[in-house]
Structure formats: structure tokens, C-alpha cells
């Protein structure tokens, strides 16, 4: 028996013992208190997986009997078993304690009362109370603004009306009863945040309202025609037409006709069974109440007569506001829509549509009211270019503004005239969605509807989303793999505060905005705007969240295929669920990034289903660590690593181990994205193409993206230099360097020390300053712009401190210490001349020193060492030090004369030349060339002032293998 089963079995015995000892039973709250007093701990609800005490006892039908009471409380009584029947009989024979009973009743009253009431609720009958019309109107007014969570209802009601919602004074014992009483206007939806109170759509749009005529002409709402089948036989429903004036009928005759029809209806239903009789009677009573008192049952016929009397005192048209003022002056009674249960004046006037005729005219700021009997309406002439106004009959209460409505007549024909086929002409530019009617619209009206459709001003029409800016090479990012087609075609989403959290905040705001029925109807997309490439939003019915989508293609009359730019997948949705996207929701770039797994390719031509399934299992629904490699045709090639376990799992290594992939040292372009890349098709780049610079690092497959303020000159000719060794076949160390850009292996991103095979190639790389001679005349052929580099901002060597910048370009050359005295004074005019020459050249800037990669190079040039002339290069064989004194190089030649060099301290005679090569198109490329003595040696000396953190993981590993040595400290000699 498991621990949970043992706890549950023990709990069953304890609850049975507690309830058996109580003759009258306990409430759930009393059971919790008694259990705490007896055991000393609370009920183990969470351990057993229950959320409440009632859920626990309902799961014990053989232990607890739930007995509901008439006042709404629940009493829990024990069900004895074979071993406790004797005890239960003894307890049942005990006399009841009146003190305990009174205390229990007080406890029940305190539990049932709301938080705002401390007094005892009087006993009531079994019939639940009716929610007053005023309270219902307040609830509709509150929820008309936006849906409210049940937990926030008290605060929202207090902020709206300045008082707390005291449901106890209306006769309710709990908020649950209030919601049941208001179920015709309020719906409760379960969300992740809790119960969400929303206004029912049927009430908000007034689609289900309709009243039979009570006085004067026979009048019916247009949407009433859809509900003819729901009313009993014998109740005539008039149809609307556009011809013939109305024939007046007296109210007494109509009432008698209704009574006769109801009697005949009762005679017909007497043969039915009892349940059908009750349903028929309920429908009859409902129709009679609606016809006499209106939909809410609060507008009586007496008030209708008073309103009619007030209206008939004026022969001319009367505004709605004047009607209410005159009503108050005549009858000394205020006609308040709130007190009568209506949300606003428009809704109240709509309830009087059988006696009032309402028009809206251009230039008027209010509705005009006429007597429906005294003002016959002319029929609409289709050949005349006159716009008529529709009769406002219970308009939607959620209308954002008073819309321009066409005038129509809903008059009935004479007795001897047959009803012609009804046609309804309505203007299409209503603010809210019009009522769904059985109408016939010709082609001209349809084109007019498309032209005059009212589009919200902040709706997105032709705007495109931006893509995320490219990531730098070697960047470590946290990612979620959102959509997978294959290891060479999948989408990721970056997990960070600037991306994923902003996306979540935007989706929460979209849900809060579009969940309001007013906004949802306002931003509904018409058919003419549903075109491929249009940016909009849609709600997924499964999770009720709103997503940004881009229409990919139209599948039919009802469905479209959309692309989700934040997640990368493609799905099918209904056209009716599409909504215009607000412009404020386009600021966040598309979060999906098309990716391909770096350095892998399938064993065969295409990825197998097992390989795709294995890749999906590796990704899962968890955050991963991604290491950026490069961009190929706009597709990010990235390494993925799972760090959730004790050992890091590299996906490319797993696919290679299981035989699904072949690891290669270059990235193959993705065929899937080459065929279809919706993100590149429907979005735009966040930066201009000239701001993105592609950098080649050693071999053609390595590319790098720099900042926007860097530029590159196009390739002009092939370089005469070549790379050193072949790329190693081993996998790179996915570990980042602690400064600068993240590097994992010096061999994977080697520093390109490009040396020529011939002696003249090496002569380009060295300079000498012995006696002002020019032993290397071939240096004249080197362009000046190839000798310039930008001063780095972050210096990781203390000895490297360049000063005296001229145009931001420096070249470092070291000369023997003996020449230091000749370099004390420098001609400033020559420096100015050199700066002018350098400014004229268009030399791009090299990368920062934090992008300087340390590479362990085993020299294979020992045979070429004889080509150099050691006599011309005065260098100590065991000392290499980076000079802190930069010098200027003449554009014509590289001289070592005192006029061309600026010297402060020279402690080494070795020449270390840092240059830039642009002939091959290699941008900001650094080369570190050693003397022949050091090229033969396999030891690489660096100054001790260099921080160890500047070396990569592989460099630190090489230090332990004696491949890299610190240069011994040598004091500077005084001259």
C-alpha cells in the first residue's frame, strides 16, 4: 500500500468517527474545525489531490452522506459500516442538545452571509429570490465595459458605483445564487486566472428579443421571424413589408384574440402528456408577460400608456431627451432606464418599439421619436436615390456610437392584401455587426457595402512585422523550439526578458482587449480584406488566447491558412474568427526564428522519420541553450544543448551517435526553407541590408554578423595569402570565452595568420628600422589602407596602451632599444601630413580587440625559414612582447627612420605586425606573424600581463599540455 492510500484510508476512519459522534451532522466548515481539534492538523487535501472539503467528501460516498438543506447549506452525516453500527444507534438515541443546535444555526448563518454582512440572514422559502431590475442593470453596466474576474468583482463593483455589492439584502445567501439569478445576462467562463464573468452575447446584441404588439398596429421586430417556431400555435406573428399603410386594430380585440388563441391552445394540448403541457403553459405565460411588460418585465402597460399620452401631446417630431423631460413634468415621475432594468435610453426606447417610431436624421444630435399610429411611413422607392432610416427597435446595447441607419417601415398590409415577399434594405456601415436577417442583397448593394465598410482607424492594413535582428556569432541564448519539420527546418523562440516576456505581456493585453465583445465585433474583418499576406489576429478556441497571424492562402469560402509569426507553425482557421490587428500590437518583432541544426546533414538525401522523431524528443517542451554559428541564406544555423540534466546533451552529437546524421564542418543550406520560408516572405528585416556585415573567418562556411555601424567594402580581387592548416575533424568545445564574443575553440574559429609561401610574401609582413635603411622595398606595393586598424575599446593587455591616435588608425612596429634616443622628438607637421593622407583613404575599421581570437598554431613553415634573412632582422630569439608604442606608416613605403616612428619605451626588438587584408574580402582580419626562430618552435609565448580569462577553454587546456608558455619577466634596461 502506498503512502497516499494509507493516508486516505486513515482519513476515512477519522471522518466517519467525527460524523458518527454528531447526531445532527456537521457542515463542511465545522468538519474542518473538528478535524483540526481532534488530529491537530488540517485536512490533507493537497496531498490527496483535492481542492476543497466538498470534493473530498463527495469522493467518499460509502463514508459520508451529503444532505442539502432548504436554506442552501449542506449537512454531512456519517454512513456507518459493520463495526460502527452499534455506535451509530447509540448516538441516534441521544437527546438533541439545543445549545449545539443554536450554535450550528449561527455558524450556518455566518457562513452563508457575504463578507460585507455580519447579521444573520432570515429564513426563506425554497423559491430563490429574483434579482431586482436595478441590480441587473448595474451588473450589465459593469460588465459592458470589460469582463471581470469573480475574485475582482467586489473591487470592480465598488470602483464603478462607489459601494460594495451587498447581495444579502436582496435575499441571496451567496454569490453563486446571484449568478444563477442573473444567468440570462451573465455567463461564467473558467480560465486560468479563475472564473471570468462576461456579458452574454445574446443579450449584448439583443438577438433574442421580440415583443408581440400590445396596442395599435400589429408590429414585430425583424429578428422575431426566426423565432416563430418557438411560440405556441395560435399566436400570430406579423411579417414586415414596405407597402400599404397600417390598418389600426383596437387593443381590446387583440387581447380577446390572444385569449381565444390561448384557450384553443389549451384544448389542443390537453391530449398531450403532463410534461408537454407544462412546457406549453410556460411558453404561453412567457409570451403574455413579454407582450404586456416587456422583456425585463419591468416596463408595465400603464407606463406605456403614459408614454403614449406624452408623445401625442406634440404634433411635431420630438427628441428622446425631450420625451423624458415632458414625461416627468406631466406625471411627476422620472422615467429612469436604470431603475427599469435597461442599460441606456436606446435600449428603453427599443422596448417601446410597438408604440414609438424612432428616426435618426443627419445634422441632428439626438433621436427623433414619433407616434407609430399617428405617423404613417412612406414606402421605400428603389428607383429614387433617397436614404431612409431604420426603425430603432431594441438596438444592440453595445453600440459604440449612434450609427447612421436606413429608414425602413415595418407596416402590415391591409386585410384583403396578400403579403408580398419581404425585402430589407440596410446601410452597411453600421458600427456593430447588424442583426442576422433573411435578406436578399443584389450585387450593387454588395459592392456598396465593401466600399463603405467602417474600418477602425488603428487597424493594420498593409503593414508588415519586423524580424528580430541577427544574432552575433558564438552568442549563447536560451531558446524554445516551437515548431519542427526536420533538424534542418525548425523554428525557435528566444527566452529572455526582451523577447518572451514581452510576447506574453502582449498576448495578455490582446486577450483583455479582444475578449470584449464590443471590440471583437468592431474589428471583425470583412471578406474583401482577407487576402494572402494580410497581418491580423485570431483566437484559438482551445486555449482562448489571441495570436498574431498572417494569411498564407485561402482554402475556400469559410477557411483560410494562416502563418503564426511568433511561433512558426501554419494552421487552418475560420474566416469569421479573423480580426483586424491593432497597430500597437505590431511594435514587437516576429519572435519566430527559422533555424537549422549546425554542422549536420542527413545520412541520406532527406531526413528520416526516425531522425525527426528523435529530434522532437530531444527538443521537448523545455528551454534549451543555443550557440549561434552563422546565417546561411537568412537561416540561422545553431547548436542546441540540453542542460537540464547532470550532463550536457548536444543534439548534433546524439544524432550522429544514433546514425541519423553526419557531422560536417560546414553548414548545408536548408532545402525546406529554400522552398518555403513564410517569415522571409511576409516580414521585413529590422535593419537595412547595408547595415549587416558578413565576415569570413578562415573558411567559406564561417560567417559573422557585426553591429550596424560597421561597413565592408565589396570584394575586388583574390588575396595572395592562404590559410594555414586544415580544419581539425573533431567537434568544437561549446564553451564561451569570458570576455568579448563567445568563443568555444581556437581551432574551430582559428586566427587567420596568413603567410606566403615565398620569401617576398614574408617581406610584406616585416619592417625594420636599422639605420634608416629600407631592406624590403617590396613593402611599397602594399596599399596604405591595408595597414590600418581601429583602436579597441577593451584592452586585455596592460602593456598595449596606444596613444596619439591619428584618424583612429595605428600600426605597431618594434625597433631595437638602442634607437630610443633618436626617437625622442617627432616632427608634428609630419604627423599631421600622415593624418591627412590616411583620412583620404577609405579604410574600414577592424573589429574590437575583444574579437581577437587566440589560436594555437603548429608551424609547418620550418622549411621556409631559410628564405628569411636573419641578418636583416635584429631580434632576440627568446623574447616577444607587444609594444605599447604605435607608429605611423607612410603610404609610399614603410621606413624605420626617426621621422616616421614615435617611441616611448622599447623592450624588444622583435617585429610583431598587425595588419588588415581586404583583397580577399576578409573583413577586419588580424594576423600575428612570428620570427623564424619562433616559427620553428612549437611554444607560443605571451606576456604575463595578459589575463588568463582572455584565453578560450582549449587554450587553457593547451597550457596544461605545455603547448603554451608564459614569457619570463625581463626588466627594462636603462640606456
UniProtKB/Swiss-Prot annotation:
Family membership noted in the UniProt record: Belongs to the TDRD5 family.
GO biological process terms held by the UniProt record: P granule organization; spermatid development; transposable element silencing by piRNA-mediated DNA methylation
Region (Disordered): 820-843, 864-905
Pfam families: OST-HTH (PF12872), TUDOR (PF00567)
Official protein name in the record: Tudor domain-containing protein 5
Function: Required during spermiogenesis to participate in the repression transposable elements and prevent their mobilization, which is essential for the germline integrity. Probably acts via the piRNA metabolic process, which mediates the repression of transposable elements during meiosis by forming complexes composed of piRNAs and Piwi proteins and govern the methylation and subsequent repression of transposons. Required for chromatoid body (CB) assembly.
Phosphoserine sites (modified residues): 891
UniProt keyword annotations, A-Z: Cytoplasm, Developmental protein, Differentiation, Phosphoprotein, Repeat, Spermatogenesis
Gene3D superfamilies referenced in this protein's UniProt entry, alphabetically: 2.30.30.140, 2.40.50.90, LOTUS domain-like
Ranges for domain HTH OST-type: 7-80, 127-202, 299-373
Organism: Bos taurus (Bovine)
PROSITE patterns registered for this protein in UniProt: HTH_OST (PS51644), TUDOR (PS50304)
Record's GO cellular component terms: chromatoid body; pi-body
Residues passing through the membrane, by range: none
Repeat among keywords: yes
CDD domains (UniProt xref): LOTUS_1_TDRD5, LOTUS_2_TDRD5, Tudor_TDRD5
Alphabetical list of InterPro entries matching this protein: LOTUS-like, OST-HTH/LOTUS_dom, SNase_OB-fold_sf, TDRD5_LOTUS_2, Tudor, Tudor_domain_containing
Localization, UniProt: Cytoplasm
Biased composition (Polar residues): 831-842, 864-894
Keyword Transport: no
Boundaries of every Tudor domain copy: 529-588
Amino acid at each position: 500500500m502506498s503512502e497516499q492510500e494509507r493516508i486516505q484510508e486513515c482519513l476515512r476512519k477519522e471522518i466517519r468517527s467525527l460524523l458518527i459522534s454528531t447526531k445532527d451532522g456537521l457542515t463542511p466548515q465545522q468538519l474542518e474545525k473538528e478535524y483540526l481539534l481532534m488530529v491537530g492538523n488540517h485536512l490533507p487535501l493537497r496531498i490527496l489531490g483535492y481542492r476543497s472539503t466538498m470534493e473530498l467528501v463527495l469522493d467518499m460516498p460509502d463514508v459520508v452522506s451529503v444532505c442539502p438543506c432548504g436554506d442552501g447549506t449542506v449537512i454531512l452525516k456519517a454512513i456507518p459500516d459493520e463495526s460502527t453500527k452499534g455506535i451509530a444507534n447509540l448516538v441516534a438515541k441521544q437527546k438533541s442538545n439545543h445549545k449545539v443546535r443554536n450554535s450550528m444555526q449561527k455558524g450556518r448563518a455566518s457562513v452563508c452571509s457575504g463578507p460585507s454582512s455580519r447579521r444573520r440572514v432570515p429564513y426563506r422559502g425554497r423559491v430563490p429570490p429574483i434579482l431586482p431590475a436595478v441590480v441587473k442593470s448595474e451588473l450589465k453596466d459593469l460588465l459592458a465595459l470589460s469582463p471581470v474576474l469573480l475574485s475582482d468583482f467586489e473591487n470592480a463593483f465598488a470602483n464603478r458605483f462607489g459601494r460594495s455589492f451587498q447581495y444579502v439584502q436582496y435575499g441571496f445567501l451567496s454569490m453563486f445564487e446571484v449568478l444563477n439569478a442573473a444567468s440570462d445576462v451573465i455567463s461564467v467562463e473558467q480560465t486560468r486566472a479563475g472564473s471570468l464573468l462576461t456579458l452574454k452575447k445574446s443579450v449584448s446584441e439583443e438577438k433574442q428579443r421580440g415583443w408581440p404588439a400590445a396596442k395599435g398596429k400589429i408590429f414585430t421586430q425583424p429578428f422575431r421571424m426566426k423565432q416563430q417556431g418557438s411560440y405556441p400555435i395560435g399566436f400570430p406573428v406579423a411579417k414586415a413589408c414596405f407597402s400599404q399603410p397600417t390598418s389600426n386594430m383596437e387593443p381590446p380585440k387583440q387581447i380577446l384574440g390572444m385569449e381565444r388563441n390561448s384557450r384553443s391552445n389549451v384544448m389542443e394540448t390537453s391530449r398531450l402528456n403532463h410534461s408537454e403541457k407544462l412546457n406549453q403553459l410556460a411558453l404561453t405565460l412567457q409570451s403574455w408577460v413579454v407582450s404586456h411588460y416587456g422583456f425585463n418585465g419591468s416596463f408595465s402597460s400603464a407606463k406605456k400608456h403614459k408614454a403614449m399620452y406624452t408623445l401625442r401631446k406634440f404634433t411635431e417630431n420630438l427628441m428622446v431627451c425631450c420625451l423624458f423631460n415632458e414625461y416627468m413634468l406631466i406625471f411627476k415621475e422620472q422615467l429612469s432606464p436604470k431603475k427599469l432594468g435597461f442599460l441606456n435610453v436606446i435600449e428603453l426606447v427599443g422596448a417601446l418599439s410597438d408604440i414609438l417610431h424612432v428616426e435618426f436624421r443627419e445634422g441632428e444630435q439626438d433621436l427623433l421619436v414619433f407616434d407609430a399610429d399617428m405617423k404613417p411611413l412612406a414606402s421605400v422607392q428603389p428607383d429614387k436615390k433617397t436614404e431612409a432610416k431604420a426603425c430603432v427597435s431594441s438596438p444592440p446595447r453595445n453600440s459604440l456610437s449612434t450609427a447612421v441607419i436606413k429608414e425602413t417601415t415595418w407596416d402590415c398590409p391591409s386585410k384583403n392584401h396578400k403579403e408580398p415577399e419581404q425585402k430589407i434594405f440596410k446601410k452597411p456601415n453600421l458600427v456593430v455587426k447588424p442583426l442576422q436577417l433573411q435578406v436578399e442583397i443584389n450585387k450593387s448593394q454588395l459592392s456598396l457595402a465593401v466600399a463603405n465598410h467602417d474600418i477602425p482607424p488603428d487597424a493594420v492594413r498593409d503593414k508588415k512585422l519586423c524580424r528580430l535582428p541577427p544574432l552575433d556569432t558564438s552568442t549563447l541564448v536560451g531558446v524554445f523550439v516551437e515548431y519542427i519539420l526536420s533538424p534542418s527546418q525548425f523554428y525557435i523562440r528566444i527566452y529572455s526578458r526582451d523577447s518572451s516576456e514581452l510576447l506574453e505581456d502582449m498576448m495578455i493585453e490582446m486577450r483583455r482587449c479582444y475578449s470584449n465583445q464590443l471590440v471583437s465585433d468592431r474589428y471583425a474583418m470583412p471578406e474583401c480584406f482577407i487576402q494572402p499576406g494580410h497581418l491580423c489576429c485570431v483566437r484559438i478556441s482551445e486555449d482562448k488566447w489571441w495570436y498574431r497571424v498572417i494569411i498564407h492562402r485561402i482554402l475556400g469560402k469559410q477557411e483560410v491558412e494562416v502563418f503564426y509569426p511568433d511561433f512558426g507553425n501554419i494552421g487552418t482557421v475560420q474566416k469569421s474568427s479573423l480580426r483586424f490587428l491593432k497597430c500597437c500590437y505590431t511594435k514587437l518583432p516576429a519572435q519566430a526564428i527559422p533555424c537549422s541544426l549546425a554542422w549536420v546533414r542527413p545520412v541520406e538525401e532527406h531526413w528520416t522519420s526516425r531522425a525527426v522523431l528523435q529530434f522532437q524528443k530531444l527538443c521537448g517542451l523545455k528551454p534549451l541553450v543555443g550557440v549561434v554559428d552563422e546565417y546561411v541564406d537568412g537561416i540561422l544555423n545553431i547548436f542546441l544543448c540540453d542542460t537540464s540534466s547532470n550532463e550536457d546533451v548536444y543534439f548534433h552529437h546524439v544524432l550522429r551517435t544514433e546514425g541519423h546524421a553526419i557531422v560536417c564542418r560546414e553548414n548545408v543550406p536548408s532545402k525546406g526553407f529554400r522552398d518555403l520560408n513564410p517569415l522571409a516572405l511576409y516580414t521585413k528585416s529590422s535593419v537595412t541590408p547595408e547595415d549587416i556585415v558578413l565576415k569570413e573567418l578562415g573558411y567559406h562556411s564561417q560567417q559573422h554578423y557585426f553591429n550596424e555601424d560597421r561597413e565592408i567594402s565589396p570584394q575586388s580581387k583574390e588575396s595572395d595569402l592562404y590559410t594555414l592548416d586544415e580544419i581539425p575533424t573533431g567537434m568544437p568545445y561549446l564553451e564561451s570565452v569570458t570576455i568579448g564574443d563567445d568563443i568555444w575553440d581556437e581551432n574551430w574559429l582559428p586566427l587567420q595568420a596568413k603567410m606566403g609561401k615565398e620569401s617576398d610574401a614574408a617581406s610584406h609582413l616585416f619592417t625594420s628600422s636599422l639605420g634608416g635603411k629600407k631592406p624590403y622595398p617590396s613593402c611599397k606595393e602594399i596599399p596604405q589602407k591595408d595597414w590600418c586598424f581601429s583602436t579597441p575599446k577593451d584592452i586585455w593587455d596592460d602593456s598595449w596602451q596606444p596613444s596619439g591616435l591619428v584618424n583612429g588608425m595605428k600600426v605597431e612596429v618594434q625597433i631595437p632599444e638602442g634607437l630610443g634616443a633618436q626617437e625622442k622628438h617627432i616632427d608634428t607637421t609630419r604627423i599631421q601630413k600622415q593624418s591627412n593622407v590616411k583620412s583620404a583613404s577609405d579604410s574600414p575599421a577592424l573589429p574590437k580587440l575583444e574579437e581577437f581570437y587566440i589560436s594555437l598554431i603548429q608551424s609547418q613553415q620550418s622549411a621556409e625559414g631559410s628564405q628569411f634573412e636573419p641578418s636583416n632582422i635584429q631580434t632576440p630569439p627568446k623574447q616577444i612582447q607587444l609594444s605599447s608604442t604605435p607608429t605611423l606608416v607612410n603610404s609610399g613605403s614603410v621606413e624605420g627612420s626617426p621621422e616616421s616612428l614615435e617611441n616611448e619605451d622599447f623592450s624588444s626588438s622583435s617585429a610583431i605586425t598587425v595588419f588588415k587584408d581586404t583583397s580577399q574580402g576578409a573583413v577586419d582580419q588580424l594576423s600575428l606573424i612570428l620570427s623564424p626562430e619562433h616559427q620553428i618552435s612549437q611554444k607560443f609565448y605571451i606576456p604575463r600581463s595578459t589575463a588568463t580569462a582572455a584565453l578560450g577553454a582549449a587554450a587553457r587546456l593547451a597550457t596544461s599540455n605545455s603547448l603554451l608558455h608564459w614569457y619570463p619577466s625581463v626588466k627594462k634596461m636603462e640606456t
